[in-house]
């Protein structure tokens, strides 16, 4: 079993790096504002048709463009969900959503969280899934990538005030990265057996003579961007464990690759744009070390079996509860770590049924900010915050002004970095406390004791860090939970983007300093260790008390 797990992890990472390297070169061209070959004429026509100017923006203008697009998308999606019964492509005549569920869903998909307090096949029409959710899957992913584009430019430009043009970046990211790759993935899914139709639900007779209603819909097209954009919201309630979404072991492997593809490619692009590819490799090493350790822990915990069943004398050599038999324990464990390390949230197994230790690792990966590869764009700019913090700590230890890529890190940058890092822990801890203090929060818990608290903590961690997965033992479709989680998702997304853009605006105006003998190298194993230690230290100090009340207490009981 250990050899199989090692081979699975090694194969996954090897294929990932091979695919991400050329994509990273393409992203580097976009960051450097170099159009891809053959696209200049198309871009010129589109810019003219849309009335888009390619004049560069300062950080405030860039931020306002990103926020404006997302707020408009939020309003459109909210009213679309409220009135879906008036809109076409609704063969099942599904009614509009309640105001609180519509708000929660709209915020969820606009913020790239894709938390779902509903069952897709019984709640949303084809039009809502396509024109509403799928469109936001593209736009939210493009928004995250655009923000990291601006931050990378801030490190490479000197004595400037502009960071690029948000509209140009969004258009290029969507047209030349997200749409083509998602199209290829969707076609592959269709070839493997995923659904893609507009038929009404089909009544079929089972082999036992009973009648069953099979849901239909344009699944493959949404499934592709759901994974590529680290969105995670399933067309069906069972998400990627549903055979209509994820029909074969091969599609399952491709889904995991798609989740990590752009975050990995952005690390390669970062190294290429900065002129020092070792910087990108440093980030990949730090992310990969944490990732491999976490996968190993989850695999080990799930292979040990369920201790509660073992205590009863039952056969539980491995923990298969809540897992698809066609995928097994090792693949389910790998997928769980992939989807929570990134801000995806898609699942092929019920995380609520993992062992206490196996379920704690995915929760902790979300709580540290999903910086281990992370979401498209958001993972890298989240990790860059920890890089700045690590550089600052190193500067304190050696008595020098901290520098990164030749830019001095001053008080303003550190205040903004601290603010951005503290946003999500504050939301998680205060949100969980509020839920446990109120009757409306506690009434949604279906399980008592430490596991019930773990379900609450997981839900708020997932929302605040824009992941979207759940422990599922929580009746979250209520006004209290819909509003609480919507607030956490909204602030967790934009409360980090705003200080990140402010940091970019501050750094782009500075001159780059030449490296000296006293400059801390930020590309070697020493800095990789310092960066990993910073991530672990912040995560451990912040969440150990809360984790001790939930999964740790459950593990020890």
Swiss-Prot record:
UniProt gene name? kdpA
- Its protein name is Potassium-transporting ATPase potassium-binding subunit
Q: Which InterPro entries match?
A: KdpA (IPR004623)
Stated role: Part of the high-affinity ATP-driven potassium transport (or Kdp) system, which catalyzes the hydrolysis of ATP coupled with the electrogenic transport of potassium into the cytoplasm. This subunit binds the periplasmic potassium ions and delivers the ions to the membrane domain of KdpB through an intramembrane tunnel.
Give the similarity note. Answer: Belongs to the KdpA family.
Q: What is the lineage of its organism?
A: Bacteria, Pseudomonadati, Pseudomonadota, Gammaproteobacteria, Enterobacterales
Q: Where in the cell is it found?
A: Cell inner membrane
> One GO term of the cellular component aspect?
plasma membrane
| Membrane topology category | Multi-pass membrane protein
Q: One of this protein's Pfam families, by short name?
A: KdpA
In its UniProt record, a GO molecular function of this protein is: P-type potassium transmembrane transporter activity
Q: Name the UniProt key words of this record, in alphabetical order.
A: Cell inner membrane, Cell membrane, Ion transport, Membrane, Potassium, Potassium transport, Transmembrane, Transmembrane helix, Transport
């Amino acid at each position: 079993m250990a050899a199989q797990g090692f081979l699975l992890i090694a194969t996954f990472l090897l294929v990932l790096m091979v695919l991400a390297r050329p994509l990273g070169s393409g992203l580097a061209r976009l960051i450097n504002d170099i159009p891809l070959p053959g696209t200049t004429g198309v871009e010129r026509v589109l810019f003219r048709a849309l009335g888009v100017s390619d004049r560069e923006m300062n950080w405030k203008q860039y931020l306002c463009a990103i926020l404006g697009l997302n707020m408009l998308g939020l309003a459109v999606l909210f009213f679309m969900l409220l009135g879906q019964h008036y809109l076409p492509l609704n063969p099942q005549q599904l009614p509009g959503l309640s105001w609180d569920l519509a708000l929660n869903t709209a915020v969820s998909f606009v913020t790239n969280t894709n938390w779902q307090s509903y069952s897709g096949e019984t709640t949303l029409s084809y039009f809502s899934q396509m024109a509403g959710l799928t469109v936001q899957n593209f736009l939210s992913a493009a928004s995250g990538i655009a923000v990291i584009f601006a931050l990378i430019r801030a490190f490479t430009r000197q004595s400037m005030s502009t960071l690029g043009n948000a509209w140009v970046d969004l258009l290029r990211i969507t047209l030349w990265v997200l749409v083509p790759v998602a199209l290829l993935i969707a076609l592959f899914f269709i070839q493997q057996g995923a659904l893609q139709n507009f038929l009404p639900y089909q009544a079929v007779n089972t082999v036992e003579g009973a009648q069953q209603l099979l849901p239909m819909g344009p699944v493959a097209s949404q499934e592709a961007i759901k994974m590529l954009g680290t969105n995670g919201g399933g067309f069906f309630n069972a998400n990627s464990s549903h055979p209509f979404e994820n029909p074969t072991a091969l599609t399952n492997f491709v889904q995991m690759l798609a989740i990590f593809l752009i975050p990995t490619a952005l690390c390669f692009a970062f190294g290429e744009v900065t002129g020092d590819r070792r910087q990108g490799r440093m980030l990949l090493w730090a992310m990969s070390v944490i990732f491999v350790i976490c996968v190993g822990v989850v695999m080990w915990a799930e292979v040990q079996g369920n201790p509660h069943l073992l205590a009863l004398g039952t056969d539980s050599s491995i923990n298969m509860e809540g897992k698809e038999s066609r995928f097994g324990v090792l693949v389910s464990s790998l997928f769980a770590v992939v989807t929570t390390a990134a801000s995806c949230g898609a699942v092929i197994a019920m995380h609520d049924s993992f062992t206490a230790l196996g379920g704690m690792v995915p929760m902790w990966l979300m709580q540290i900010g999903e910086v281990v590869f992370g979401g498209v764009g958001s993972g890298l700019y989240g990790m860059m915050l920890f890089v700045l913090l690590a550089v600052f700590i190193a500067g304190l230890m050696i008595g020098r002004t901290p520098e990164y890529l030749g830019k001095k890190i001053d008080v303003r940058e550190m205040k903004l970095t601290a603010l951005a890092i503290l946003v999500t822990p504050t939301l998680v801890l205060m949100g969980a406390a509020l839920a446990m203090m109120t009757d409306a929060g506690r009434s949604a818990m279906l399980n008592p004791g430490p596991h019930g608290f773990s379900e609450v903590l997981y839900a708020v961690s997932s929302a605040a860090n824009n992941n979207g997965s759940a422990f599922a033992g929580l009746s979250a479709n209520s006004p209290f939970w819909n509003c609480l989680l919507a607030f956490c998702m909204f602030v967790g997304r934009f409360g980090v983007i705003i200080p990140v853009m402010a940091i970019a605006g501050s750094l782009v105006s500075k001159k780059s300093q030449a490296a000296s003998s006293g400059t801390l190298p930020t590309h070697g194993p020493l800095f990789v260790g310092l960066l990993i230690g910073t991530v672990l230290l912040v995560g451990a100090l912040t969440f150990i008390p809360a984790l001790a009340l939930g999964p740790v207490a459950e593990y020890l009981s």
